[in-house]
């Protein structure tokens, strides 16, 4: 097995707690599904949020869907003028037999505009 990183992001419709939890769960579920992963394959996940998302930690959504013993961390993105608002990003470190070219990076909703080069 090789260690790989998987990227992803989702843009939320609002900044409330439920929106953060729902969108983060959707993003994590899609990353896992598209890359044929189980939580045993995940080494760690780093979540970031844009400065306008303060109602909840995105990691809570991952805990609620089964990431009980996976190290998770949340951080704030820097406030860049003109940056896309209401975005949760993730970078998951995983163990996989897939080559780097076969990793499915997941960008949902409006966040697809962030990485047209790798969004699937």
Where in this protein do the model-derived segments appear?
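Terminal domain-initiation and capping elements
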Residues: 1-120
